[in-house]
Structures are given as C-alpha cells and as structure tokens.
Amino acid sequence: LRDGWSGRCLSNTSQKVNVTSVELLTIMKAKSKPMSEANPSPLVSGEVGDDGRADSQRSLARQIIDIVRGEADLFHDQEKRGHVLVDWEGHRDIFRIGSEDFSHYLAHVAWRHFGEALSSYAQEKITGTLESIARFEGEKRMLYLRTAWDQGILWYDLGDWKAVKITTSGWEVVENPPILFRRFAHGKVQVDPVEGGELRNLLQYLNIDPKKQRGMEILLLTYLVAVLIPDVPRPILAPHGLPGSAKSTYSRVIKSLIDPSLLEVMTYPSQSQELIQMLAHHYLICFDNLSDLSERQSDELCRACTGQAFSKRALYSDDNDVIYCYKRALLINGVSLVATKSDLLDRSLIFELEPIPPNKRIDEETIMKRFEEEKPKLLGAIFSALSKAMALREQGVIELKMKPRLADYALWASAAAMALGYSVNDFIGAYQENVELQNA
C-alpha cells in the first residue's frame, strides 16, 4: 500500500493489489471504523478526491490567507491572543482569531471573492496559520474595556465605533477613535452624552434622599466620576436594605449609566472560572440579591477590586495557565450587608437604603423610562466633572493629609468632589462616616 491511498481504492476490482494478511487485517479494521476515521477528509490525508475538491479547498485556503493578510491588520493583544482588525463600511471591526465572528468573517471572504464555501478543515487550517502569524509576526496592541488612557487623554467607549475623548479642557464624541476596545455580545450601545445635565438629578432614581443622606450622596456621585479612571482600585458599592428599598433598581441604574449591558444584574457564580469570565467581559459587575458570601467569595471580590491575579486553564488538553489581572468595578446588594469579612468591608462603600413607603412607590418600568430620557444629560454631567477632576489633578491642588485605604481612588474622588461643587473635606468626612459604618 502506498501512502495516501484509502480503503476505497483497494475495493476497485479493476485493479490488482497484492496485500499480505497483516495488511488485509489492517484494511478490514479500517473499513469497520466510522467514515471520519477510515476515510479521512481529502484535505487531511492529502488525497485528491474524485471531484478535485481537496485541491480546490487547499488553493482556496492559501488565497484566503493572502487576502486576509492584505485587507486586515493581524496583531496580538496583551494576553498573546491573535486578532484581525478590518476596515468595514466606514468603521473598524476587531475579530479574535478562532472566535465565531472570525469564522463568519472567513466564510464571508470566501464567498465574497470566490463564491465558494469553506470546508471546516480549511477553516481550521486558515485559523491556525493566521493565529501563528498574528502572534509571532503581528504587532502587540493593547485592547481595552470601556475606558483607557492614551497620552494624557481619557477615552470612554460608547460601543458603536464611537468614543468620548476627555481632556482637561472638556470632552467630545469622536468617530473611530485610535484606541482599540474589546466588545462582547452582551454589551449595549451607550447613549451619546449631551451637555447641560445636573448629576444630582440621578438621586431621584436611587432612593437616596440628599436632605437626610448627604454623605451617601457625596460618596455615590464622586464614585460615578472616579470609577471611569482605568486601572485604579475602586471601592465596592454595597447597597443593602429590606424588601421594597429598590436595591435592584439602584443596581440597574448604576450599571446602565457606567457600563450598559443586556446583563444588568447577575447572580454570583458558583465556580471561580465563571467569575474570571465575568471579569473579562464586564467593566462593572452588579451581583444582585446576595444572602451571604463565603470566605472564598469575599477573597475573590477583594482580588477583583485591587487587581490581584487569577489563573485559568488555557485548554483542558494541556497544563498551561492563562494569568488574568483585572481591576473591576463591583456592586453587591442584599437585604443585609453581605460584606462581613474585614478585608472586604475595608474596600466597600456602604449604602443603607430605606423601604419606600407605599404611597411613594413608582413602578420600575416608569422609573427606568424617566431615567433613560435623562441619561444623555447625566452622562454628559459625569464627563464634565471628570474633565474638571483631571485638570485639578494635573494642577496638583488635591492633597490628602491622611491617605485612607484605596488612596489612589480617594485622590480621584476628592478631585471629583471639587468638580461637583463639594469640598475635599466633604468627601473625606463622608468617607470617614463610611469607615465608621464598617466598624459598627
């Protein structure tokens, strides 16, 4: 038997083939196997099929690799994963090589240029080749989630190939920003911000009475500004209250304003691997209606807040670990305060929400409708305050005599307080009250 011959050639009675008993036994075993093993794809074995499709697919694969290299930019990210950057209909799309979107892109290239479909094996070989090119020949580029610094400019991704450019002199919406952002299927397009809003108007949607709860007001509004600073460990928002205190509405409003998603609130995952996936895909995660937290879960939240490393198995077929370091914004709500471990309490902003009296309750649909109508101005107010806070930090006028835990955040929140019309002492006083709640 010659290499590359398949069992079906031996069954052709018009040819004489001399085989030994051992070879015959091997052939019989092969013929008894499933078709995928006994008669592999022509592209796998190297054999040319009767219709020449194997050669056609091989040629098509080579041509598609050349086309992709010509029309797309191949690069790898900070986690050494390959991507293609494609200019398409006036905007730039990023596809992670090996993803479902990337497979659709390859299929479209084949159809657009040749009017042919790709075999699964051809797709696999194209994918493997382009992944290696992106990893070993492509440039390393950072991919960001929702916000990013670049040369003193802060960028906020709106999710529709637009971003907000924030500087010390103001902000503007920019088409096709120079920063590359990750996007995921759950993500929703953020509204375009507009000027002229008042951030304090947000409190009416959050069951916070500024006359009675000024400290909570200051802590929350400064948080909404400072949370957009990337790579700074932020405190965890921890609202709690009895049923009817609008905890879930509070969480949905915050999530929508900062990091809009189809997944507004989520349950805490049972496995650490699921949590890593969530951290990779969300800038702000809201865990809803928690009853308690185990020691492991408390530790995970602390690590996710401060950016300590998580490891995740790359493939079940090997022992390679992928190391992830995320500093994520987190919100945890429950009937009682679920942050009970000292390390987690030290990293939390505690908000005790009171039940809304029956005569003052408004259904959530109405609240969210009103919020969505005002959201562009609220978002614009955040960016205006953030621009002022950046200018204050640049001028060096923010100084803290005693730096609390999460000191970098406290500096930004103090600048945000001044930008919003409060004083640094107002923020520090509210922050200290929060510490006292932790120790109560």
Give the location of each predicted region.
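N-terminal nucleic-acid engagement/recognition segments and initiation subdomains in replication
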Residues: 17-192, 277, 384, 388, ...
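P-loop NTPase catalytic core of nucleic-acid-dependent motor ATPases
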Residues: 85-91, 170-281
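Short, hydrophobic/amphipathic alpha-helical patches that form generic packing surfaces
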Residues: 107-111, 128-135, 218-231, 383-388, ...
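Catalytic acidic motif of RecA-like/P-loop NTPases
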Residues: 291-292, 302, 306
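Non-catalytic accessory segments of DNA primases and related replication-initiation nucleases
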Residues: 1-27
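Structural motif
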Residues: 53-59, 206-219, 371-377, 402-404
